[in-house]
Amino acid sequence: RIADVDWVIEAVVENLRIKQQLMARVESVIRDHAVVSTNTSGLPIHLIAQGRSESFRKRFLGTHFFNPPRYLKLLEVIPTTDTATEIIKRMQWFARLHLGKGVVVAKDTPNFIANRIGTYAIMLGLRALTEHGYTIEEIDTLTGTLVGRPKSATFRTADLVGLDTLMYVAENIYPAIPHDESREIFHVPPLLRKLVETGSLGAKTGQGFYKKQGKEILSINPVTLVYEPAKPLHLGDIEAIEKIPDLGDRLRALYQDKGRAGTFFREFILNLLGYSARRIPEIADSPIEIDQAMRWGFGWELGPFEIWDALGFETVLADMKAVDIPVAEWVKKDGEMGRWGDGRNESILMSPSTPLDEINLATLKADPKNTLWQNPEAALLDLGDGVALYEFRSKGNTLSLKVVDGLAEALDILETGDFRGLVIGNSGANFSAGANLAEMAMLAQSGNIQAIANLIVKFQSLMQRIHYFPKPIVAAINGRVLGGGCELVMACPQVVAAAETYIGLVELGVGLIPGAGGLMRMVTWAADRAATESPHHIQPFLQKAFETIGMAKVANSAYEAQEFGYLAPTTKIVMNSDRRLYVAKEEVLRLEREGYAPPPERNAIMVLGRPARAMLEHAAYIMYQGGYISEYDRFLASRLAYVMTGGELTVPSLVDENYLLQLERETFLPLLSQPKTQERIAHMLKTKKPLRN
């Protein structure tokens, strides 16, 4: 079969002899132009191709995917000295555009870039546990979300990777780097070896550094090797630092802390930054590759050199010298030349150039002239070529009152100004978490139902205005797109979605129904999918939409979102999320060039009336009897069915959009007064998880 393909990826056992034998077999059957790559994470790339023809070696390289490949963006491309330049460029282009990867060209050195630096960081944490008296929980607190890294931090990450895998990686690195001045950090500590020998390998065996016992999370005592409940943290005023919203400010506050937290962080980060700098040019040609590798492969918000920038070049350099941490020669040289330094425009990290098919919002916003309008939670930006961008800046990109009012203001500007169209999007990891529940809860608790009613009318009117706006509006979405965020996207005439988009109408999870046009559009979707207006043909699609919303299903990808009805078949799906704003802008320009006209108003939507409502309610009853949903879920499902079948209509009828929007409003408002809905909202705000009461 591989004789017919253009790219062969090898991912067999990490044994050099086996890989070499396989490559000999592969060479005998592949096409003359086929690219061959190895996914090895530790073996020298050039040795795997040893003995192969010159033609084969020109088309051979390493392609190290990070697991799971679908969700981790990093792809390390590792050419050998024989790899043809055009092959490297072709693989970079293909992986970025069609696989959605962040591609970093690494050198053929032990464990390449991300695993070399990432393993070093984990081993630093292990040393602090065994030599400096910090607890597992303290180290994970100081190396997790507090400093812009995943919640798994150090020891949870080790457990997830597998302690046997971690030990294998460290043992693989250690003998392969005899000239690394810090190689002793990779020496496997007795605690790690003991855990592996006793079969405590982490998540895959149920215990490693952590162990879950019932609902309690225990951690290993490094002295007694007994799992114990977490002890109180002795990290001074760490809670105050955790509350600082900006990561750069948070890092600086932690770095300057005079207690145990600051002591740990300074030693940890100075060693990490020093080591990263000393690995240039051994493992990478510049700081950019290392930062990208750590952000894309390990999920760090800032790479090592971006952290250095945040803390201040001269501050970090002086502190390294004060504690005798070796400073890389290139850092010394450029520092002496005055190239970098606190308060200067230049930094230790030369910003990577943005590809032509991406839009860097940070660069765009650096020029004040590009900000056309703003409030504390949103802004209207000039993307150039007559296209504007409405950007959310609220917490979680929620649709707060300021965001909703700002969007209306943006449409006013767009309508009267010399603009060709609008993109709605942002650079966050998630497009929108939905409506601002905290604002809604405050209004409900105050008894100001009329204010909520007015807000719903405002939101519905805004969604309709977007849908029928005379100029093209394109949503550029990615990540989570929930509740009101989903309704906003469904209102946009055109959408550009990252493949990794998780979109859904999840309002039933907080005891409500979609109230900003989401139900109206799903009813319309069901009617449009049917072959005719016959209730018999519409019913299966309506049933599917009812189940999707009733179970608060979130699509697992943009492709599944099209199946669910959240995204239209015309949605443009991009594999690389970084391209979504650029592609959305191009869509605006294309639509405008083609003589854009808004979609026609829908004045004849077929709803199925009481017979269909009875069928939907019966389906909910079966779910309730089977123990799949609660009694209150069943009640909510009945209200959902009421709206989706046309309210009190007794027979299938044609209605307009306003009829369904009114049903949404009339059904939504009473639910806010229900105690169980208020419990669900309070629980979501407190725990970020739905309550099924």
State the predicted function of each range.
Residues 1-429, 438-471, 478-484, 490-492, ...:
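N-terminal glycine-rich phosphate-binding loop for ADP-containing cofactors
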